[in-house]
Design a protein with these regions (language model features):
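Short, structured coil segments at secondary-structure junctions
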Residues: 8-10, 18, 116-118, 172-173, ...
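Predominant activation on well-ordered alpha-helical scaffold segments within soluble catalytic domains
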Residues: 2, 44, 144, 187, ...
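Asp-based, Mg2+/Mn2+-dependent phosphohydrolase catalytic module
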Residues: 172, 176-212
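Conserved acidic, metal-coordinating active-site core of Asp-based
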Residues: 46, 50-160, 164-169, 181
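Hydrophobic/aromatic beta-strand patches that form the interior of the parallel beta-sheet core
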Residues: 15, 158-160, 177, 194
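Hydrophobic packing residues within well-ordered alpha-helices of enzyme cores
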Residues: 1-5, 109, 113, 170-173, ...
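A general structural signal for well-ordered alpha-helical segments in protein cores
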Residues: 1, 40, 94, 106, ...
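Active-site phosphate-binding/coordination module
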Residues: 1-71
Length: 212
């Protein structure tokens, strides 16, 4: 997860898994929220029995998969990460499950999981990606934790987002920018917009902030 920071020569805390994990500047875990490995196994058994599709497990900085298909290969290319063989021995907490499948399958799985399981946050990060986390996980909680730890006022913070799991963060920070390529509901909920990801919207917004 930290290779982006390494490439940019940035040494700073990093929030991952929609706020489920925070690593400090030395890659040490300082904040962690997830569900039990028992819950992860229940979810895994259900998904495999009814849908027979690959399931990704995220545990701290490990990405583990039970099998590799085209979707997993594409995710590996996008992230620059190499998946590990699934091994839950010694694991006590899972930060996230990810299912990559056809949009119709993802829709049906999302509905069935929400009916069958409680205490979880289940959402589509895109049409073919279904993410499953503990219901306590949020980006706003992670930001609040970091601000308290670093003694930074929320009015001094800036955030950028394009999807529904960004909304709580965008509403919490001093300035929250919705990316032009964001989901319609995000654009309607957040009054301040910037250019799209492809148009370097983050840089554009920061340049304007510096000029204020």
């Amino acid at each position: 997860m930290h290779y982006f920071l390494d490439e940019l020569h940035i040494k700073a805390p990093m929030v991952s898994y929609s706020g489920g994990l925070i690593l400090d500047e030395n890659q040490k875990v300082i904040y962690s929220k997830g569900f039990s490995v028992e819950m992860a196994k229940r979810l895994y058994k259900y998904i495999k029995y009814y849908y027979q599709i690959p399931v990704s497990f995220y545990v701290e900085n490990h990405w583990m998969v039970d099998e590799i298909d085209e979707g997993i290969e594409e995710e590996s290319i996008i992230t620059g990460l190499k998946p590990e063989k699934l091994d839950l021995n010694g694991v006590k907490k899972v930060h996230k499950l990810l299912v990559i499948a056809e949009a119709g399958i993802v829709d049906r799985l999302e509905m069935s999981l929400k009916e069958k399981f409680s205490g979880l946050k289940i959402y589509k990060s895109k049409d073919t990606y279904l993410e499953i986390m503990d219901e306590s996980v949020s980006k706003s909680s992670a930001i609040q934790f970091l601000c308290d730890k670093m003694k930074i006022g929320l009015h001094q913070t800036v955030s950028f987002g394009d999807n529904y799991n960004d909304l709580d963060m965008l509403l919490l920070t001093g300035k929250g920018f919705a990316m032009a390529n964001g989901a319609q509901g995000v654009l309607e909920s957040i009054p301040t917009h910037t250019l799209s990801n492809d148009e370097d919207g983050v840089v554009y917004a920061l340049d304007n902030l510096v000029g204020e």
